[in-house]
From Swiss-Prot:
Residues 3-135 form the PINc domain. PANTHER family: PIN DOMAIN-CONTAINING PROTEIN, PROTEIN PHOH. Its EC number is 3.1.-.-, 5.6.2.5. Pfam families: PhoH, PIN_4. This is Protein PhoH2. It comes from Bacillus subtilis (strain 168). ATP binds at residues 259-266.
Length: 442
């Protein structure tokens, strides 16, 4: 039996192509949704871009028929702009205020009631990214779903960048003697390029080692940087060791680091960037950026000069730089950075759209980027540059993103089989016991 899917505005603003995601079913867009989309077209951010894209898609579909009737889609389904079924009679005793959310609920509920009177009535399902809209729908007896087509993977299945590998003492001897072993010698295991193997004794002994798959995924090699001490820090756990290996390898220009606050992502990335920029001269500049304000905003509306506006948003970066430079007095770090000149701390707004060659680029809080934003960013990376995306997918500030459809998760999953990239999920916090407990419990 076919179904009727009523789309909320946030679904279209998250994915303009959502109307093509419902196979051979009917897609209904309430008129109020078009009004909300229209109000967002002037925005110069991702939401505005998607609003303009949706408008163009729907306009193109006008050529196939009348939008208030049934326009055929390539999926085998149909699209309809719903101008009627706006009565609040079924909602007024529960939701008195005529907000746009409630108007969308009214359309879906009235359509559902109409279908119930038919002999072969179809299920009506409201699709929304808004949790409270789905809760309201349930309260009035209306089927509701989240839009899941934009999710790259289930949370428990997100690529960690490593896996346990139990091997024999003979293979341990071969690994330490030849600095590598063939994946063919490890039964029932396959590896992505640059995926780590946490090797353990299959008989329960104390032997252990960490290897990394080569570019073909057929050989496990010893780490190049397995005991590094850079800029006064060294890895405190095996995940940090693996992260540092990726950060220091010139042949891996894309690195993704996932972890909660306190797992060492920012400190390790900054130390690796400083080493390769200031000490080794591999890169001409170290650029650190993060998306700093809610969607649809910019720091231009804040008072003060650019540096004054950036300071509060970028303070976590400056805190780590103060630690690495051992800056203890107020203003000392500013003087150090001004003297060096090759370290640039920016809002993401200021580097997006530029070509970025020969630079070590760190993007913090990358979980707040959309797929389009992260694509735009990566396609601007110039020759000879390395880019590090890091963040915690469980800490999303973007209104239309979640832990499974954000730009960081998207890159991790899409690039996990590519020889130019590597990823590590850091699990252990290295701050105080209180900080780790707070990250786990709160």
């Amino acid at each position: 039996m076919s179904k009727i899917y009523v789309l909320d505005t946030n679904v279209l603003l998250q994915d303009p192509n959502a109307i093509f995601s419902f196979e051979e079913n009917e897609v209904v867009i309430p008129a109020v949704v078009l009004e909300e989309v229209d109000s967002k077209k002037r925005y110069m951010d991702e939401v505005g871009r998607n609003a303009r894209h949706v408008s163009k898609l729907i306009d193109a579909l006008r050529q196939k028929g009348r939008l208030h009737e049934h326009v055929p889609l390539d999926t085998g389904g149909t699209l309809r702009i719903e101008l009627n079924h706006r009565s609040f009679h079924q909602l007024q005793e529960i939701f008195i205020e005529k907000t746009n959310d409630n108007r969308i609920l009214a359309v879906a509920k009235n359509l559902s009631l109409e279908e119930e009177t038919k002999e072969n009535g179809r299920p009506v399902i409201l699709v929304s990214k808004d949790v409270l809209v789905r809760v309201k729908a349930d309260a009035i007896g209306l089927l509701a779903e989240d839009f899941l087509n934009d999710r790259v993977v289930d949370n428990d299945e997100m690529y960690s960048g490593y896996k346990d590998l139990y091997i024999s003492q003979q293979l341990f001897s071969s690994f330490y003697g030849k600095n590598q072993i063939s994946v063919n010698d490890v039964k029932q295991h396959a590896f992505y390029p640059n995926q780590f193997a946490l090797m353990k004794d299959e008989l329960g002994g104390s032997s252990s080692a960490v290897g990394i798959a080569d570019k073909t995924g057929t050989v496990l090699k010893r780490l190049v940087f397995d005991d590094e001490h850079i800029w006064g820090i060294r890895p405190k756990n095996v995940q940090q060791t693996m992260a540092l290996e990726l950060l220091l390898r010139e042949d891996i220009p894309l690195v993704t680091l996932i972890g909660k606050a306190g797992t060492g992502k920012t400190l390790l990335a900054l130390a690796a960037g400083l080493l390769q920029t200031e000490d080794l001269g591999i890169y001409k500049k170290l650029v650190v950026a993060r998306p700093i304000v809610p969607v649809g905003k910019d720091i231009g509306y804040l008072p003060g000069e650019k540096e004054e506006k950036l300071k509060p948003w970028m303070q976590p970066i400056f805190d780590n730089l103060e630690f690495l430079f051992n800056a203890k007095k107020p203003g000392e770090l500013d003087a150090i950075l001004a003297g060096i000149g090759s370290i640039q701390v920016e809002a993401l707004t200021y580097i997006r759209g530029r070509s970025i060659p020969d630079q070590f680029i760190i993007i913090d809080e990358a979980q707040n980027l959309t797929r389009h934003e992260v694509k735009t960013l990566l396609t601007r990376v110039g020759e000879g540059s390395k880019i590090v995306l890091m963040g915690d997918p469980e800490q999303i500030d973007h209104p239309y993103l979640d832990s499974l459809n954000n730009g960081l998760a998207y890159v991790v999953e899409r690039f996990k089989g590519q020889p130019i990239s590597g990823s590590v999920k850091l699990l252990k916090g290295e701050r105080s016991g209180l900080a780790q407990l707070a990250a786990d419990l709160l």
